[in-house]
Amino acid sequence: MATQIVEDTIKSKGRRTDVGDILKPLNSEYGKVAPGWGTTVLMGIFMALFAVFLVIILEIYNASVLLDGISVSWASLV
């Protein structure tokens, strides 16, 4: 038979640790959703700042000394 009935066994609850006691309050809000937009606007601001950061890094890379004297036109690849 593919399925099998297993007798109920007593499951251990696990050890209690100091770190677990400290972190327990952080998990008490698990599954709850704040009404409204919450921190969505803040997340959008940080995403925009990160995009600006990436553009700045790209500009620095494109103006790099490593690329001086290297032709970057598609015609040079033919």
UniProtKB/Swiss-Prot annotation:
Modifications the protein undergoes after translation, according to the UniProt entry: Phosphorylation is a light-dependent reaction catalyzed by a membrane-bound kinase; phosphorylation occurs on Thr residue(s) in the N-terminus of the protein.
Organism: Chara vulgaris
Topology in the lipid bilayer: Single-pass membrane protein
Name of this chain's protein: Photosystem II reaction center protein H
HAMAP family: PSII_PsbH (MF_00752)
UniProt entry keywords in alphabetical sequence: Chloroplast, Membrane, Phosphoprotein, Photosynthesis, Photosystem II, Plastid, Thylakoid, Transmembrane, Transmembrane helix
Compartment annotation: Plastid, Chloroplast thylakoid membrane
Entry function: One of the components of the core complex of photosystem II (PSII), required for its stability and/or assembly. PSII is a light-driven water:plastoquinone oxidoreductase that uses light energy to abstract electrons from H(2)O, generating O(2) and a proton gradient subsequently used for ATP formation. It consists of a core antenna complex that captures photons, and an electron transfer chain that converts photonic excitation into a charge separation.
Family according to the record: Belongs to the PsbH family.
